[in-house]
Amino acid sequence: MAELPIAPVDRLIRKAGAQRVSEKAAKLLAEHLEEKALEIAKKAVDLAKHAGRKTVKVEDIKLAIRS
């Protein structure tokens, strides 16, 4: 189960043009977004470690997103 709240995900889907959103659809998207965010975060942590830092910086996140 996703840790991301369902309500903001529901709003994102509605912002994309949906009039109604099922709870299952919002939960599935939340799970996918969480998996993708975790993947990016792990890459960013590796980049920070490689640079000899413990702190993840915005540059690490940007680079992780591009890779």
UniProtKB/Swiss-Prot annotation:
CDD domains: HFD_archaea_histone-like (cd22909). Homodimer or heterodimer with another histone. Dimers then assemble into higher oligomers, with the DNA wrapped around the protein core. It is found in: Cytoplasm; Chromosome. Belongs to the archaeal histone HMF family. This is Archaeal histone B. NCBIfam families: archaea_histone. The lineage of its organism: Archaea, Methanobacteriati, Methanobacteriota, Thermococci, Thermococcales. It comes from the Archaea. Keywords: Chromosome, Cytoplasm, DNA-binding. One of its GO terms (molecular function) is protein heterodimerization activity. PANTHER family: ARCHAEAL HISTONE A (PTHR47828:SF1). The keyword Electron transport does not apply. It comes from Pyrococcus abyssi (strain GE5 / Orsay). Binds and compact DNA (95 to 150 base pairs) to form nucleosome-like structures that contain positive DNA supercoils. Increases the resistance of DNA to thermal denaturation (in vitro). One of its GO terms (cellular component) is chromosome. Residues 20-22, 54-57 are annotated as: Interaction with DNA. Gene3D superfamilies: Histone, subunit A.
